[in-house]
């Protein structure tokens, strides 16, 4: 129970929702996590290899700050140098069918998973490289 001003209660409610406190169907999300742990671990190395493929392609670019050796999972986060704009890049690649996210104004996050095969990662790498060259 929280007793406070209206402002603090509203703020606490926002924090609760941000942390998942408003979820009513948490079991559905938990079920997908269990499936991932029980059935998908055998192919996890493919996701990691695909992430490494993306990292190697991007790590060669002078506009990108990324050490491919640091990519150990299926997540690739890279930083744009100079006049880079992460949101502009995310928008540009989205228009060409590649989903990415921003992590601040200069950093972009890519995630590989079982629905993204090697050929798709190769296409995504080419699209991201071309977009960076066009934008920056």
Indicate residue ranges for each PLM-predicted region:
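PLP-dependent enzyme catalytic core of the Aspartate aminotransferase-like
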Residues: 88, 106-136
């Amino acid at each position: 129970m929280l007793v406070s001003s209206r402002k603090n209660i509203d703020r606490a409610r926002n924090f609760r929702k941000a942390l998942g406190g408003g979820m009513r169907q948490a079991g559905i999300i938990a079920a997908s996590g269990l499936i991932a742990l029980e059935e998908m671990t055998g192919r996890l190395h493919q996701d990691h290899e695909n992430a490494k493929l993306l990292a190697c392609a991007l790590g060669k670019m002078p506009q990108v700050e990324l050490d491919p050796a640091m990519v150990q999972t299926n997540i690739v986060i890279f930083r744009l140098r100079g006049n880079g704009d992460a949101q502009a890049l995310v928008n540009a690649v989205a228009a060409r069918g590649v989903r990415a996210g921003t992590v601040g104004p200069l950093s972009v996050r890519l995630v590989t998973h079982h629905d993204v095969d090697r050929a798709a990662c190769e296409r995504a790498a080419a699209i991201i490289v071309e977009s960076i060259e066009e934008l920056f």
